[in-house]
Amino acid sequence: MTEQKPKPSCHNVMVGNYVPTASDRAANRTLGFGLVTNIINGGLDC
């Protein structure tokens, strides 16, 4: 539930507290399940 820079907290995304930055919008990262999936699986974790 804690953010790990540069990724935001999944919890904040799910409850609507996350506000996408200009770079997020430029990369077409929008609020929703897809962003949560990207946060969980989009880093070096995989």
From Swiss-Prot:
Protein known as: Endochitinase 2
The enzyme's E.C. designation: 3.2.1.14
Origin species: Arachis hypogaea (Peanut)
One Pfam family, short name: Glyco_hydro_19
InterPro entries for this protein: Glyco_hydro_19_cat (IPR000726), Lysozyme-like_dom_sf (IPR023346)
UniProtKB keywords: Carbohydrate metabolism, Chitin degradation, Chitin-binding, Glycosidase, Hydrolase, Plant defense, Polysaccharide degradation
Family: Belongs to the glycosyl hydrolase 19 family. Chitinase class I subfamily.
Annotated signal peptide: none
Catalytic reactions of this protein: Random endo-hydrolysis of N-acetyl-beta-D-glucosaminide (1->4)-beta-linkages in chitin and chitodextrins
Function: Defense against chitin-containing fungal and bacterial pathogens.
GO molecular function, one term: chitin binding
Induction remark: By glucan and P.megasperma elicitors.
GO biological process: cell wall macromolecule catabolic process; chitin catabolic process; defense response; polysaccharide catabolic process
